[in-house]
C-alpha cells in the first residue's frame, strides 16, 4: 500500500462527496454524516482491529474504508453502501494503492449497511461496528423527523 489514510483525507473529491452527502441527509432529517463522523468511524475501525491484534496494513485499510464509507450518500441514501463502494473504486483505482487493497476497501464499504451487507472480512466487520458506535448526541441535525418533513417542506 502506497496511499495512506492521511493522503486519503486530503483528496478533495472524497471530502466533497462527504460534504454533499451530509448536506443531503441534513435536508432529509438524518443525523450528521460529515467529515467528523467519517474521521470518528475511521478511528474506531482502526482501534477495533488494533485491539484484535491485526497488522498495520489491515488497520490502515479499515481506517480508509471508515473515512470513505458514506460517500454514497452524495447520490442517494437508499443503497448508499453500494453506490459508495462504486465511487470508492473509481477514486482509489487512480491512486498508488494496489488493486487488491482497493477491492478490500470497496467490499467493506459495500457491506457496511446493516440492511444489505454482511461482515465478510475483518475490515468490513470493523467498519460495521465502528459506524454503529458513533452515537454522539450532537449528530442530530434536524429535530423534525424525515418522515414528517414532507408536510413541513
Question: Which stretches of residues belong to each language-model region?
Answer:
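Acidic/His-rich, divalent-metal-binding segments that scaffold phosphate/diphosphate chemistry
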Residues: 1-80
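Inter-helical turn/loop segments and adjacent helix faces that build the functional surface
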Residues: 52, 95-99
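Short alpha-helical catalytic segment bearing the HExxH-like zincin motif
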Residues: 62-66, 83-84, 109, 128
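Conserved small/polar residues in nucleotide/adenosyl-binding loops
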Residues: 152
Amino acid at each position: 500500500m502506497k496511499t495512506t489514510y492521511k493522503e486519503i483525507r486530503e483528496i478533495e473529491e472524497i471530502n466533497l462527496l462527504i460534504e454533499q452527502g451530509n448536506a443531503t441527509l441534513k435536508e432529509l432529517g438524518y443525523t450528521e454524516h460529515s467529515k467528523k463522523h467519517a474521521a470518528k468511524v475511521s478511528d474506531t475501525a482502526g482501534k477495533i482491529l488494533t485491539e484484535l491484534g491485526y497488522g498495520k496494513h489491515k488497520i490502515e485499510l479499515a481506517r480508509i474504508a471508515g473515512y470513505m464509507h458514506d460517500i454514497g450518500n452524495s447520490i442517494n441514501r437508499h443503497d448508499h453502501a453500494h453506490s459508495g463502494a462504486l465511487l470508492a473504486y473509481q477514486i482509489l483505482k487512480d491512486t498508488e494503492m494496489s488493486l487488491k487493497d482497493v477491492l478490500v476497501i470497496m467490499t467493506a464499504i459495500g457491506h457496511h449497511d446493516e440492511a444489505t451487507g454482511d461482515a465478510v472480512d475483518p475490515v468490513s466487520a470493523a467498519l460495521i461496528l465502528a459506524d454503529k458506535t458513533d452515537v454522539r448526541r450532537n449528530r442530530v441535525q434536524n429535530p423534525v423527523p424525515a418522515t414528517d418533513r414532507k408536510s413541513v417542506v
